[in-house]
């Protein structure tokens, strides 16, 4: 996995840094694990925009990913490492000994031909999934469950991981990708290693068109809008007149938006590191 730099033959190529896709071993996805994906353009069932800056982009099919890793005791062979347009990580196609095929997130270092196991008796090797109770302290993990059996929810993006810091009674202490220290039940599953494609954060699209191919539309600054459109709009020339805030009037800098008295507060030992 590396990044490709180009000769500046056009303005769009000058600063472009994109993956070389050297880890991809198969270009066609497994048809049995595909489902149609309808475009929403950031709209809800009323047709109102609920997520800004979305729309257009290349047509996609959704790849069904196994986040639960609940097929215990049956070895699986890594058949291919593939590109997934719906996420930043690469995905790996597993073929289990009984013939079943499943996609998982491809961790760093996983290669075609490797054997993977799920369950409490699996070895501590990259790609294997175990309950936190069976993972040694200090291990780097990803695709971590919050609720046993629900499937991994934490550390699923390219290059992310959490670290198992301690185990005490029913809970394991994890250092999250954000730096937050949080308790998670030891019966929750996690996968050994960090998510692959770790150079994703260094990518440079180079031109607006590449963002449009991804379905990302332009972001307009509030200060350039009219007062009807944004709290920071209006005025003569470039005039703020307000503290930086969202289109709905919520302060944008330093204001805590987490709901107070959340039940999960008791599981957070230390808040994430501040910017």
UniProtKB/Swiss-Prot annotation:
<keyword id="KW-0699">rRNA-binding</keyword>
<dbReference type="GO" id="GO:0003735">
    <property type="term" value="F:structural constituent of ribosome"/>
</dbReference>
<dbReference type="GO" id="GO:0016740">
    <property type="term" value="F:transferase activity"/>
</dbReference>
<keyword id="KW-0689">Ribosomal protein</keyword>
<keyword id="KW-0687">Ribonucleoprotein</keyword>
<feature type="region of interest" description="Disordered">
    <location>
        <begin position="221"/>
        <end position="275"/>
    </location>
</feature>
<comment type="subunit">
    <text>Part of the 50S ribosomal subunit. Forms a bridge to the 30S subunit in the 70S ribosome.</text>
</comment>
<dbReference type="InterPro" id="IPR002171">
    <property type="entry name" value="Ribosomal_uL2"/>
</dbReference>
<dbReference type="InterPro" id="IPR014722">
    <property type="entry name" value="Rib_uL2_dom2"/>
</dbReference>
<comment type="similarity">
    <text>Belongs to the universal ribosomal protein uL2 family.</text>
</comment>
<dbReference type="InterPro" id="IPR014726">
    <property type="entry name" value="Ribosomal_uL2_dom3"/>
</dbReference>
<dbReference type="InterPro" id="IPR008991">
    <property type="entry name" value="Translation_prot_SH3-like_sf"/>
</dbReference>
<keyword id="KW-0694">RNA-binding</keyword>
<dbReference type="InterPro" id="IPR022666">
    <property type="entry name" value="Ribosomal_uL2_RNA-bd_dom"/>
</dbReference>
<dbReference type="InterPro" id="IPR005880">
    <property type="entry name" value="Ribosomal_uL2_bac/org-type"/>
</dbReference>
<dbReference type="GO" id="GO:0002181">
    <property type="term" value="P:cytoplasmic translation"/>
</dbReference>
<dbReference type="GO" id="GO:0019843">
    <property type="term" value="F:rRNA binding"/>
</dbReference>
<dbReference type="InterPro" id="IPR012340">
    <property type="entry name" value="NA-bd_OB-fold"/>
</dbReference>
<dbReference type="GO" id="GO:0015934">
    <property type="term" value="C:large ribosomal subunit"/>
</dbReference>
<comment type="function">
    <text>One of the primary rRNA binding proteins. Required for association of the 30S and 50S subunits to form the 70S ribosome, for tRNA binding and peptide bond formation. It has been suggested to have peptidyltransferase activity; this is somewhat controversial. Makes several contacts with the 16S rRNA in the 70S ribosome.</text>
</comment>
<dbReference type="Pfam" id="PF00181">
    <property type="entry name" value="Ribosomal_L2"/>
</dbReference>
<dbReference type="Pfam" id="PF03947">
    <property type="entry name" value="Ribosomal_L2_C"/>
</dbReference>
<dbReference type="InterPro" id="IPR022669">
    <property type="entry name" value="Ribosomal_uL2_C"/>
</dbReference>
<protein>
    <recommendedName>
        <fullName>Large ribosomal subunit protein uL2</fullName>
    </recommendedName>
</protein>
């Amino acid at each position: 996995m590396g990044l490709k730099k180009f000769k500046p033959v056009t303005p769009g190529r000058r600063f472009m840094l994109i993956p070389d896709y050297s880890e991809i071993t198969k270009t066609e996805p497994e048809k049995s694990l595909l489902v149609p994906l309808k475009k929403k353009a950031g709209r809800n069932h009323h047709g109102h925009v609920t997520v800004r800056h979305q729309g257009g982009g290349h047509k996609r099919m959704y790849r069904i990913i196994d986040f639960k890793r609940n097929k215990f005791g049956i070895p699986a062979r890594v058949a291919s490492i593939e590109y997934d347009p719906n996420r930043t990580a690469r995905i790996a196609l597993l073929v289990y000994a009984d013939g079943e095929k499943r996609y998982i997130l491809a961790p760093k270092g996983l290669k075609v031909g490797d054997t993977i196991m799920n369950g409490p008796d699996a070895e501590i090797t990259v790609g294997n999934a175990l309950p936190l109770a069976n993972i040694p302290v200090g291990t780097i993990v990803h695709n971590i469950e919050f609720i046993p059996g629900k499937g991994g929810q934490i550390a699923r993006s390219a290059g992310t991981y959490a670290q198992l810091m301690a185990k005490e009674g029913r809970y394991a202490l994890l250092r999250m990708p954000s730096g937050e220290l949080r308790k998670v039940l030891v019966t929750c599953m996690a996968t050994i290693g960090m998510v692959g494609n770790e150079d994703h954060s260094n990518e440079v699209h180079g031109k607006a068109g590449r963002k449009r191919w991804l379905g990302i539309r332009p972001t307009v600054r509030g200060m350039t809008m009219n007062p009807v459109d944004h709290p920071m709009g209006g005025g003569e020339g470039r005039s703020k007149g307000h503290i930086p805030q969202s289109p709905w009037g919520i302060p944008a800098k330093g204001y805590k938006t987490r709901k107070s008295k959340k039940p999960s507060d008791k599981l957070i030992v230390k808040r994430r590191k501040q910017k």
